[in-house]
Amino acid sequence: MKIYLVGGAVRDQLLNIPIKDRDYMVVGATVQEMLDKGYRQVGKDFPVFLHPKTQQEYALARTERKTGVGYGGFSVYAAPDVTLEEDLLRRDLTINAIAQDETGRVFDPYGGQADIEQRLLRHVSDAFVEDPLRVLRVARFAARFQPLGFKVAPETMALMQRIAASGELEALTPERVFQELDKALSTEAPQVFFEVLREAGGLAILFPEIEALFGIPQPEQWHPEIDTGIHTLMVLEQAARLSQDKQVRFAALVHDLGKALSPKEHLPKHHGHGQKGLPLIRALCERFRVPNDYRDLALLVSDQHQNIHNAFELRAETMVKLFDKADLWRKPERLPQLLLACEADCKGRTGLKERPYPQGAYVQHCFELARNVAIKPIIEAGFKGAEIKAQLHKQRVEVIDQYKRKTAVNAKP
């Protein structure tokens, strides 16, 4: 019985980046031997055990054979005669198919170290095409390791395109697709996930609402990049620069879906695109069972980003109605998220990524002024029932209106 550290831990160690999880592979052992040593079995589909003291995962060496459609269509063989090389052969990328024994000796039968040096994401074997989930995984690794200079090997991209053309991506469950999307959103360069998916032919299959944005023109005066799809990924890139919040990044990704619905005769203008995008966002979120907090922020950003961009021109009445509609009195934490997504939208344009976004601080200040209007004096003044709400609204509008007049005077030369 031999134990090896495998996968991401060995890869990250060779890349000199922090190791998140340590996974171990056991060669030459049976299930009973593992149980006798105090390991606790947790794997349903194949033998995976938790170490009795560290609770780290130990999996018996195994091989997999394609028996059906999708990422779950495999039969697993785990037995003491499965070798280290056979187990590593089933893995997706060479950089993930490196092992290290307990003495620190590295085993690299498929050239993973050379690919780390060349910054290449390359498949281990042609069995790569048997698992459609790997298209998403490679796109995610491309996003994660883009800051280190990694690229997808051309021959691996060809296999990803083959998987997309085969129709197997449709066999992926919504939960697994969102799981990969969510992990991609947490990387430093989430836009790369979608760029790689698009090159592989998977974007049109899994995220047709985003694919539809490519080729849709915008006014060059406001959007030097012109193409809405390019703008969308630039906005996502800026959202990642501005915030670690995955909800903000998701909202940035889908904020302009409505532009794909603009009538051709109106292009490159997109009147009401924020509202047109709302049903598309709802459908996408329902399809992938996106968490409600992601969905709600995305809907808010799509609906209100034009108003936030035009904040200095908004009437105080409109501003308070925006706060009402966004339910910010009960959920004030939503406002910074909304403003960050809008700032990313402003900066996600060619040549404008360093442009200031004073609308953010302005709207936040207006909200704080309105939120500080006290309800107690209104009640003490004798207002009752619906009158209280009306008076509260009136005073909120007045306090913002005073601030608007004051800032307008101060802004004059």
From Swiss-Prot:
Record-linked InterPro entries: CCA_bact, HD/PDEase_dom, HD_domain, NT_sf, PolA_pol_head_dom, PolyA_RNA-bd, tRNA_CCA-adding_enzyme
Paired cysteines (S-S): none
Tree of life domain: Bacteria
Cofactors (names): Mg(2+); Ni(2+)
Catalytic reaction list: a tRNA precursor + 2 CTP + ATP = a tRNA with a 3' CCA end + 3 diphosphate; a tRNA with a 3' CCA end + 2 CTP + ATP = a tRNA with a 3' CCACCA end + 3 diphosphate
Record: residues binding Mg(2+): 21, 23
Residues annotated to bind ATP: 8, 11, 91, 137, 140
Binding positions for CTP per the UniProt entry: 8, 11, 91, 137, 140
GO biological process: RNA repair; tRNA 3'-terminal CCA addition
GO molecular function, one term: magnesium ion binding
Domain HD: 228-329
Database matches in CDD domains: HDc, NT_ClassII-CCAase
Cofactor detail note: Magnesium is required for nucleotidyltransferase activity. Nickel for phosphatase activity.
EC numbers for this chain: 2.7.7.72, 3.1.3.-, 3.1.4.-
Keywords: ATP-binding, Hydrolase, Magnesium, Metal-binding, Multifunctional enzyme, Nickel, Nucleotide-binding, Nucleotidyltransferase, RNA repair, RNA-binding, Transferase, tRNA processing
UniProt note: domains: Comprises two domains: an N-terminal domain containing the nucleotidyltransferase activity and a C-terminal HD domain associated with both phosphodiesterase and phosphatase activities.
Family: Belongs to the tRNA nucleotidyltransferase/poly(A) polymerase family. Bacterial CCA-adding enzyme type 1 subfamily.
Subunit structure: Monomer. Can also form homodimers and oligomers.
HAMAP family: CCA_bact_type1, CCA_bact_type2
General function of this protein: Catalyzes the addition and repair of the essential 3'-terminal CCA sequence in tRNAs without using a nucleic acid template. Adds these three nucleotides in the order of C, C, and A to the tRNA nucleotide-73, using CTP and ATP as substrates and producing inorganic pyrophosphate. tRNA 3'-terminal CCA addition is required both for tRNA processing and repair. Also involved in tRNA surveillance by mediating tandem CCA addition to generate a CCACCA at the 3' terminus of unstable tRNAs. While stable tRNAs receive only 3'-terminal CCA, unstable tRNAs are marked with CCACCA and rapidly degraded.
Further comment: A single active site specifically recognizes both ATP and CTP and is responsible for their addition.
Name of the featured protein: Multifunctional CCA protein
Species whose genome carries this gene: Shewanella loihica (strain ATCC BAA-1088 / PV-4)
